[in-house]
């Protein structure tokens, strides 16, 4: 993938860029692997906004991705196409298995049309192959990693993401995550070899607010610039600080949303670097 920069023909295109999509080999998805994806606009079943800044955007179809691959152990699959997926930053690969089944997977870096991939404990160590952590050499770069055996891939699924298997002790393998955190994961959990492709995605300059609207993202407006009828921080003469601890439009406290005593915290070997310690 490469980034194509636009010429400054209009203010919105000045400085903006777009992916060249050179790796895409087909523009229409596999019909049997798409599902309707109705828009919710951030509303729940009662019609109230539960997630702000969502709405509009281009119509999409959901591509069903195989995040498990357990049931295809020992069955070879040929990469038929590399496709665009509007629901994620990574590209997806359409696999044609020798038994006639078709599946989508996250497309790792350097995976190309015509390659053959496989899954199972005896698979080769090459991009796109899926194995349990107990069968992967220490030091290997991975993506689409399970957190629980059979639970499906949860870690390192977005464009350019990867984790590294840095050690293996007993029933746990130690993974270095993109944040710098080192975490124990059961060696029965599966992972796919290689890093996720489309790493240049993070370098795209969207250029104008309208391109965000195409993605279904609405503007983010601070509460302190609203009126009192719209937000607890609104109103006042001139600039104000809000006058209270940060709250959401419903008056509930905002910030610090992560539980400090999660059960899975005991699996963390070294915490991610935060604040001044990031360097």
Curated annotation (Swiss-Prot):
One of its GO terms (biological process) is cytoplasmic translation. Gene3D superfamilies: 2.30.30.30, Nucleic acid-binding proteins, Ribosomal protein L2, domain 3. Residues 30-59, 225-279 are annotated as: Disordered. Residues 253-268 have a biased composition (Basic and acidic residues). Residues 50-59, 269-279 have a biased composition (Basic residues). It comes from the Bacteria. InterPro entries: NA-bd_OB-fold (IPR012340), Rib_uL2_dom2 (IPR014722), Ribosomal_uL2 (IPR002171), Ribosomal_uL2_bac/org-type (IPR005880), Ribosomal_uL2_C (IPR022669), Ribosomal_uL2_CS (IPR022671), Ribosomal_uL2_dom3 (IPR014726), Ribosomal_uL2_RNA-bd_dom (IPR022666). HAMAP family: Ribosomal_uL2_B. NCBIfam families: rplB_bact (TIGR01171). This is Large ribosomal subunit protein uL2.
């Amino acid at each position: 993938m490469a980034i194509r920069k636009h010429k400054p023909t209009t203010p919105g295109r000045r400085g903006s860029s777009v992916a060249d999509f050179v790796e895409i080999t087909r523009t229409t998805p596999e019909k049997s692997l798409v599902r309707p994806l109705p828009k919710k606009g951030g509303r729940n079943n009662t019609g109230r906004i539960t997630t702000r800044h969502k709405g509009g955007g281009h119509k999409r179809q959901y591509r069903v991705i195989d995040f498990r691959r357990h049931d295809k152990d020992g069955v070879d699959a040929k990469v038929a196409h590399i496709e665009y997926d509007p629901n994620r930053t990574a590209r997806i690969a359409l696999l044609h298995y020798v038994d006639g089944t078709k599946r989508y997977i996250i497309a790792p870096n350097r995976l190309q049309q015509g390659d053959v991939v496989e899954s199972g404990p005896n698979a080769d160590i090459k991009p796109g192959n899926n194995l349990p952590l107990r069968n992967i050499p220490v030091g290997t770069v991975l993506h689409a990693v399970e957190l629980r055996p059979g639970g499906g891939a949860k870690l390192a699924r977005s464009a350019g993401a990867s984790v590294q298997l840095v050690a293996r002790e007993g029933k746990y393998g130690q993974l270095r995550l993109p944040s710098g955190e080192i975490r124990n994961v059961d060696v029965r959990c599966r992972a796919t070899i290689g890093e996720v492709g489309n790493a240049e995605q993070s370098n795209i300059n969207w250029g104008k607010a309208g391109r965000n609207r195409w993605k279904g993202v609405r503007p983010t407006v601070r509460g302190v610039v609203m009126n009192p009828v719209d937000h607890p921080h609104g109103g006042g003469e001139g600039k104000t600080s809000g006058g209270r601890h940060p709250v959401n439009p419903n008056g509930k406290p905002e910030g610090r949303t992560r539980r400090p005593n999660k059960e899975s915290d005991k699996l963390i070997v070294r915490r991610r670097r935060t604040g001044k310690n990031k360097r």
